[in-house]
Amino acid sequence: MGKLLKPIKDVGIVGYGAYVPMYRIRNEEIGRVWGISNFPIEEKAVPGLDEDAITIGIEAARNALKRAKIDPKDIRAIWFGSESKPYAVKPSSTVIAEAIGATPDLEAADFEFACKAGTEALQAAIGFVASGMAKYAMAIGADTAQGRPGDHLEFTAGAGGAAFIIGEKSSETVAYFEGSYSYVTDTPDFWRRQHEHYPRHGNRFTGEPAYFHHVVTAAKTLMDELGLTPEDFDYAVFHQPNVKFPLVAARMLGIPKEKVLPGLLSGRIGNTYSGATMVGISAVLDIAKPGDRILWVSFGSGAGSDAFSIVVQDAIEEKRNLAPKVEDYIKRRKVIDYALYAKARRKYII
């Protein structure tokens, strides 16, 4: 048996949707407060006082439903990936399912795997639909990422998410999956213990042993298993903790940056963690043409990567205009100062 993950039935994306909060804080503003002058990105998205990973997931799910044009009651599974769930004990997926009118006849669960929790949910949704157990399944990745005040994570930890409704490949799918591959090891590059408020990072483990090793290995293995080369892809979306890492990974794989830039959003909204590649793919689907092939590689600390190859179909031409596009949310912005940011992110502890 080969390494490629490919279900017996062909499945695809029936609908997709993204959401990015309106507020932004510039890296210069964070640097002003902490006396730092080297910035990894321009600005990041900040959730409002009434927003969290669940509300972001709901907005993304509603947009996916608009594009799918299906009855939410036909969705038999909603799986939500996040590392910033509002409840330690209580599923976020049930709240989302209720909000979009999908209850009660469905599976629901929350997934965790750092920044690739959303694509873990996607792998499960692909298998669930392909098995014949469901007509449609929804996978969501959303986060309101946190960074310790003054830590370099504070400059990049953003907020946003995306949802994908999976169904059997048909004239209604906007793109179909050619195959996928997952690669995991026990690599301690990033963690947060129970009762700790902010995550810690393993510094020297972050780059080569973690991100680059897993992303490049997953991408290369997927291409080898499918008999494809970098030249066969029109776009590539990699996990984007910053702007630099995805471009370096692309260079290591022989992929020109022009294929990466359309889905590279972290410079403008930050690292949305579980939502990062899913929002990036949504942005690419907003502009892609039928027949375009997209390489999609997530990464989650701890560590692992999921790699997918998807091919865009004719239905994208109509469906992409049925809900707000990623660029619409990025342009809908209001810049705030550090004081309001700290209040919105509840960094003041009394």
Curated annotation (Swiss-Prot):
CDD domains: init_cond_enzymes (cd00827). GO terms for biological process: farnesyl diphosphate biosynthetic process, mevalonate pathway; isopentenyl diphosphate biosynthetic process, mevalonate pathway. Its EC number is 2.3.3.10. It comes from the Archaea. It catalyses: acetoacetyl-CoA + acetyl-CoA + H2O = (3S)-3-hydroxy-3-methylglutaryl-CoA + CoA + H(+). Pathway: Metabolic intermediate biosynthesis; (R)-mevalonate biosynthesis; (R)-mevalonate from acetyl-CoA: step 2/3. The keyword Manganese does not apply. CoA binds at residues 204, 244. Keywords: Acyltransferase, Isoprene biosynthesis, Transferase. InterPro entries: ACP_syn_III_C, HMG_CoA_Synthase, Thiolase-like. (3S)-3-hydroxy-3-methylglutaryl-CoA binds at residues 115, 156, 206, 239, 271, 301. One of its GO terms (molecular function) is hydroxymethylglutaryl-CoA synthase activity. The active site is at 83 (proton donor/acceptor), 115 (acyl-thioester intermediate), 239 (proton donor/acceptor). HAMAP family: HMG_CoA_synth_arch (MF_01409). Interacts with acetoacetyl-CoA thiolase that catalyzes the precedent step in the pathway and with a DUF35 protein. The acetoacetyl-CoA thiolase/HMG-CoA synthase complex channels the intermediate via a fused CoA-binding site, which allows for efficient coupling of the endergonic thiolase reaction with the exergonic HMGCS reaction. Catalyzes the condensation of acetyl-CoA with acetoacetyl-CoA to form 3-hydroxy-3-methylglutaryl-CoA (HMG-CoA). Functions in the mevalonate (MVA) pathway leading to isopentenyl diphosphate (IPP), a key precursor for the biosynthesis of isoprenoid compounds that are building blocks of archaeal membrane lipids. Belongs to the thiolase-like superfamily. Archaeal HMG-CoA synthase family. This is Hydroxymethylglutaryl-CoA synthase. It comes from Pyrococcus horikoshii (strain ATCC 700860 / DSM 12428 / JCM 9974 / NBRC 100139 / OT-3).
